Amino acid sequence: MTKSGSKSEKFLLIDGNYLVHRSYYVSFKFKNNFRSTIYLFFQTIIKIIKNLNPENIFIAFDEEGGTWRHDLCKEYKSQRSKMEDEFWNIFKAIREILDSINLNSGGFRGHEADDVIATITSKFKDENQIYIFSRDKDLLQLIDKNVYITHDNELKNLISIENFYQNFQLEPDQIVDFKAIAGDSSDNLKGIAGIGEKGAKNLLNNFKSLEKIFDSLESTNLISKAQKQKIRDGKEQALFLKKIVTLNKEVPMKLEKELFAIKININEEILEKLDKYDSRYVLKQFEKALESDDYLW
């Protein structure tokens, strides 16, 4: 089954890594982590689709191996522990299920899921509405007039261009500069020493961009002498970091619109194949949701 529509359509782009992790840690409330994670993963997608009713979907994942960021910066995410065997098995099972039912998903070797989402967003945002499901702050740089981000299944707390400054005291196009100055401990990236998040926001509110901070450094009275020296000392690091945290919007992936139309293929043969994951119940729910009168295409 496939959904198609008017020129302006809704794209649902899901950060698959985030959703698997979230489902996994919530699953500890239940007895069977493996089965519960798979169930929660697909239940979340069902809820989002019901609330958003998108015409198009893509679930983006990181692929195995390093990325161009690791090539540039050996310290990038180096502090993160390796996946536990149980989690890795669940991750692979979810990927297999998605492939088996033909729900649009994947990644691109050498790039992160964020880059894939950025590429799809850049391609389609001018004439469509893009809804990104993630809690990854790197994706905030993509917010635009037709681009929204949420991690709420009910879509009640959308981050949009209208409420962005209220939430972050920055504009979306300042996010990469903010991270370049303040660093990002979650990715093991050190910014300009001694500035911090509050200092980074103050600088960007006064000077708008990293480059304008450097251009104004010797003439402005809005930066203390001590802070000026910190900025001089950290200039090269900040410029380097900006390259690392800027999402690549040109991942060489296929971008024909029809490839993103919601379509699934769930039949008895596929269900039997996937019975090893005890996923029949939630997949039947998924199929039923997509075939209901409210969401029929």
UniProtKB/Swiss-Prot annotation:
Domain 5'-3' exonuclease: residue ranges: 171-262
Pfam families: 5_3_exonuc, 5_3_exonuc_N
SMART domains reported for this sequence: 53EXOc, HhH2
Superkingdom: Bacteria
Keywords from the named record: DNA-binding, Exonuclease, Hydrolase, Nuclease
The UniProt record lists the keyword Zinc-finger: no
GO molecular function, one term: DNA binding
InterPro entries associated with the record: 5-3_exonucl_a-hlix_arch_N, 5-3_exonuclease, 5-3_exonuclease_C_sf, DNA_polI_H3TH, FEN, HhH2, PIN-like_dom_sf
Gene Ontology biological process terms, A to Z: DNA replication, Okazaki fragment processing
EC number assigned by the record: 3.1.11.-
Disulphide-bonded residues: none
Role this protein plays: 5'-3' exonuclease acting preferentially on double-stranded DNA.
PANTHER family registered for this protein in UniProt: 5'-3' EXONUCLEASE FAMILY PROTEIN (PTHR42646:SF2), FLAP ENDONUCLEASE XNI (PTHR42646)
UniProt protein name: 5'-3' exonuclease
Organism: Mycoplasmopsis pulmonis (strain UAB CTIP)
Organism ancestry: Bacteria, Bacillati, Mycoplasmatota, Mycoplasmoidales, Metamycoplasmataceae
